[in-house]
């Protein structure tokens, strides 16, 4: 894919043709009394506003604590994000770039993080190249390419850490990036604590009633399953955040079905947690012979983030096997080295 094709796909070009998601911000942390007029009064200082709404409880008509502001161009959004913190109705609120509905099939979209996950990393990519490229979105504090422990070659993904979560949001909205002549796709690189927060957000949004256009959920609605941290799963191959498994396993949501709440076939993992032949992974999803999810039953064992392994390794969050596992379940006692601050080659 060429730079021109990347720009066309990402909606770059004339401000009048900019996609709405590049011109919209989500504003959380509003008081129950915040009105559209109060939001407009504050955000009009950054430029022309084309639409504004405070999401309200259908019964009480009071603010549900968040809303959206759409500007006439992306430059107004940039100006607003540079002038944080924002104080509306006497309270510091939480503005961030809005995620379009067609991308909103992952609850983590509304969780802020300073770390960016980068897929499509090739052997001719270096950490310095990642730093040089992504510096245009903000100050990069760290870049790392994840290597295979045996071959010392890139496993196809890496991470870039910024000093501000808004830099990550800008990169995610851009979708695809050309780094050293190769297309790289990005998403938020959430920690397990941030993933837990994302799930709580998802649960809260599900209970929050309908949005203005009738879609269930709060922050632009909810959605289905995610992709894989480290690319598609291979039968018998290594997992993303975990050791090798027997049958098939996935990365963050897996490749043999889907992520949160989506049904899958065969075997699959959650956070890179490999599975043996049967059993579901992900958050509450079903597949094969058992259910995964947060503590869901799996072959008469408790499942974790992606469920337990059939062998000696236990599950992740809440998962138990014969031994305690790591993130999503790992073989034996080996845990994800990066999470422990150890060797980066995993």
UniProtKB/Swiss-Prot annotation:
GO terms for cellular component: catalytic step 2 spliceosome; chromosome, telomeric region. CDD domains: RRM2_hnRNPA_like. One of its GO terms (molecular function) is RNA binding. Residues 23-123, 114-191 form the RRM domain. Residues 332-346 have a biased composition (Low complexity). InterPro entries: Nucleotide-bd_a/b_plait_sf, RBD_domain_sf, RRM_dom. It holds the Pfam family RRM_1. One of its GO terms (biological process) is mRNA splicing, via spliceosome. Residues 216-296, 303-331 have a biased composition (Gly residues). Residues 92-107, 189-215 have a biased composition (Basic and acidic residues). Residues 92-111, 189-346 are annotated as: Disordered. Keywords: Chromosome, Nucleus, Repeat, Ribonucleoprotein, RNA-binding, Telomere. It is found in: Nucleus; Chromosome, Telomere. PANTHER family: HETEROGENEOUS NUCLEAR RIBONUCLEOPROTEIN A1, HOMOLOGOUS TO DROSOPHILA SQD (SQUID) PROTEIN. This protein is a component of ribonucleosomes. Overexpression gradually increases telomere length, leading to increase lifespan. This is Heterogeneous nuclear ribonucleoprotein A1. It comes from Caenorhabditis elegans. The gene is hrpa-1.
């Amino acid at each position: 894919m060429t730079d021109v094709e990347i720009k066309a796909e990402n909606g770059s070009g004339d401000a009048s043709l900019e996609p709405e998601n590049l011109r919209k911000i989500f504003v959380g942390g509003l008081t129950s009394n915040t009105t559209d007029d109060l939001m407009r009064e504050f955000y009009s200082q950054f430029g022309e506003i084309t639409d504004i709404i405070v999401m309200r409880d259908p019964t009480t008509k009071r603010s549900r604590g968040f809303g959206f502001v759409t500007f006439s161009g992306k430059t107004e959004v940039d100006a607003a994000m540079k002038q944080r913190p924002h104080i509306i109705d006497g309270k510091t609120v939480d503005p961030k770039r809005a995620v379009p509905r067609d991308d909103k099939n992952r609850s983590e979209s509304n969780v802020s993080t300073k770390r960016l996950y980068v897929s499509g990393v090739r052997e001719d990519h270096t950490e310095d190249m990642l730093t040089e490229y992504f510096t245009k979105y903000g100050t990069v504090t760290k870049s790392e390419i994840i290597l295979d422990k045996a071959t010392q070659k890139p496993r196809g993904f890496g991470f870039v850490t910024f000093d501000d979560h808004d830099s990550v949001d800008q990169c995610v909205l851009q979708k695809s990036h050309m780094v050293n002549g190769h297309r790289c796709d990005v998403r938020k690189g959430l920690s397990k604590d941030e993933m837990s927060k994302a799930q709580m957000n998802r649960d809260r949004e599900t209970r929050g009633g309908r949005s203005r256009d009738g879609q269930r959920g709060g922050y632009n609605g909810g959605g289905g399953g995610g992709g894989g941290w480290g690319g598609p799963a291979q039968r018998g191959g290594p997992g993303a955040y975990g050791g090798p498994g027997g049958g098939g396993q996935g990365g963050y949501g897996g490749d043999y079905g889907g992520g949160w709440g989506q049904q899958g076939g065969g075997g699959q993992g959650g956070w890179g947690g490999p599975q043996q032949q049967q059993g579901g992974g992900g958050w509450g999803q079903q597949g094969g012979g058992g259910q995964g999810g947060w503590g869901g039953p799996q072959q008469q064992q408790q499942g974790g983030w992606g469920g337990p392994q059939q062998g000696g390794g236990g599950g992740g969050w809440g998962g138990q096997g014969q031994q305690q596992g790591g993130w999503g379940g790992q073989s034996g006692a080996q845990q994800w080295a990066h999470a422990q601050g150890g060797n980066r080659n995993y």
